[in-house]
């Protein structure tokens, strides 16, 4: 395998996604035209553009539109090769480059990004608080909010089927901190695509939530 690269300019042609024009993340390959994209970019293109390759408009069959084939050769190279962030110059494995952007201050300054607080609605009151932070159940990555946790797990661990405790469920009042789920990544995607805090007060238990819902429905019916 080639030795570690010194800067991102040497790898842009092979490891850049044609859609987002950034380093590939969870690379997938079309089966007919063999073009490679970030999995997320490809799935978004399928939802908006139909059954065509986002680059050449070649045909994409039904099965790969919902379950694209991972470009394991590209993924392996990215796990072996290193490069420098084009914004801050920090060296790392290419596989982790796009994840690095989430914490790269210069990248966030370039695109005008900044951390946001979440507003929690509790009856007629609303308060500002910091989003809860989670640790990835499959690796040492930590200090992730819910959205970042899902993105990290889908980008780094999507094809791993591991029985683990869900880190989000474990923090909820009605959750069981020792109950495991057979495929924690599939569970996260099925149960945690939205943030409970945006719809309810997570500091009260499930029975109290039910009573509030009944009371509110009674007010509406009157």
From Swiss-Prot:
GO terms for biological process: DNA double-strand break processing involved in repair via single-strand annealing; double-strand break repair via homologous recombination; protein autoubiquitination; ubiquitin-dependent protein catabolic process; Wnt signaling pathway. A zinc finger (RING-type) spans 17-57. Residues 202-220 form the UIM domain. The keyword DNA-binding applies. The keyword Magnesium does not apply. InterPro entries: Di19_Zn-bd (IPR008598), E3_ubiq-protein_ligase_RNF138 (IPR052498), ZF_C2HC_RNF (IPR034734), Znf_RING (IPR001841), Znf_RING/FYVE/PHD (IPR013083). A zinc finger (C2HC RNF-type) spans 85-104. Gene3D superfamilies: Zinc/RING finger domain, C3HC4 (zinc finger) (3.30.40.10). It is found in: Chromosome. Interacts with nlk.2 (via C-terminus) and ube2k. The zinc finger domains (C2H2-type and C2HC-type zinc fingers) bind DNA and mediate recruitment to double-strand break sites. They show strong preference for DNA with 5'- or 3'-single-stranded overhangs, while they do not bind blunt-ended double-stranded DNA or poly(ADP-ribose) (PAR) polymers. This is E3 ubiquitin-protein ligase RNF138. It comes from Xenopus laevis (African clawed frog). The gene is rnf138.
């Amino acid at each position: 395998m080639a030795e570690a690269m010194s800067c991102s300019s040497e790898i842009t042609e092979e490891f850049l996604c044609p859609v987002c024009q950034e380093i590939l993340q969870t690379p997938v390959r079309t089966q007919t035209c063999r073009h490679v994209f970030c999995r997320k970019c490809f799935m978004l293109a399928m939802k908006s553009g139909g059954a065509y390759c986002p680059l050449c408009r070649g045909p994409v069959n039904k099965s790969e539109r919902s379950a694209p084939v991972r470009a394991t050769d590209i993924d392996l190279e990215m796990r072996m090769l290193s490069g420098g962030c084009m914004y801050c110059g920090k060296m790392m494995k290419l596989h982790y480059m796009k994840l690095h952007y989430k914490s790269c201050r210069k990248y966030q300054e370039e695109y005008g990004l900044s951390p946001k607080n979440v507003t929690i609605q509790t009856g007629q009151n609303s308060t500002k608080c910091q989003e809860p932070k989670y640790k990835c159940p499959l690796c040492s990555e930590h200090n992730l909010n819910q959205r970042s946790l899902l993105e990290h797990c889908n980008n780094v661990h999507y094809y791993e089927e591991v029985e683990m405790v869900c880190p989000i469920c474990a923090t909820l009042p009605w959750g069981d901190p020792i109950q495991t789920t057979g495929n924690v990544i599939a569970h996260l995607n099925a149960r945690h695509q939205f943030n409970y805090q945006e719809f309810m007060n997570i500091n009260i238990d499930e029975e109290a939530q039910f009573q509030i819902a009944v009371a509110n429905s009674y007010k509406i019916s009157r």
